[in-house]
Amino acid sequence: MAIPPSSAPTSLAEAAAKIAEELAPDLVGVQECDYWLERSGNAHQIADIATSISTPYFAFAPSIIGTPGEKWRKLQASDKRMITNADSATQYEGSYGIGIASKIEVVKWHRLDLGNAPFGAPLLIAGDESGPGKPRMLYIRDEPRLAIAATLAHGYTVINAHLSFVPGYNLRQLN
C-alpha cells in the first residue's frame, strides 16, 4: 500500500506556492518528506519546497531508507544522516524523513534520533490505492523517528519533530 495513496507531481508545487502566497513564512518544517523515491517522482521534496517559497537554506534528515508502508530499512552507519542545501547536488539513496526550509541563515543543523516503538498499532485507513472507500483497519509497524533542528543566525533554534503514532510512546519521545 502506498502512503500517501496518490502523488500528483504538481500537487507539491501548488501547495508550496499557496503557502508562500498566503502565509509568507520565513521557515517551514515538513514531515513525511520524500527524497528520491519513485512514489513522488524521484523528487527532492524539501529542496523543491525551498525553491518554491524562496528559502535558500534547507535540510532533509532521513528516518528510513526506502518507502514507508512498502520496503524500507533503518539507517546504517554509512548512510548520510543530513542532506543540506550545501550538498544537495549529490544524490543519495531514496529515503523518507523530515526537513526544514528557512529564509533566515542557518548556522548549524542538528539531528536527534528518537527511536521507534517496539510494536506498531492498528490504524483506520479510508479506502485503498483505487480511491476513497470503506474504512478498514490496517496494522502498521512504527518507523524510526527523529527531530531536526536549525540554529539560525539571529540565535534562535527551531525544531521539527516527527513523533511516533503509537499512543504513549510519542509522549516518551518528548522527554
Model-derived segments and spans:
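Membrane-interface segments of envelope glycosyltransferases acting on lipid-linked substrates or membrane lipids
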Residues: 66-71, 109-110, 117
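Acidic/histidine-rich helix-loop elements
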Residues: 1-14, 122-141, 164-171
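Hydrophobic pocket-lining residues within nucleotide cofactor-binding pockets
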Residues: 33, 63, 106, 114, ...
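A short local loop/turn or secondary-structure capping micro-motif enriched for an aromatic residue
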Residues: 68, 116-120, 166-168
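Conserved beta-strand positions
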Residues: 30, 160-161
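Beta-strand-turn-beta hairpins that frame and shape the catalytic cleft
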Residues: 94-108, 112, 118-126, 141-160
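N-terminal, active-site-proximal structural segment of metallo-dependent hydrolase catalytic domains
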Residues: 1-95, 171-175
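Short, solvent-exposed loop/turn elements at domain surfaces
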Residues: 37, 110, 168
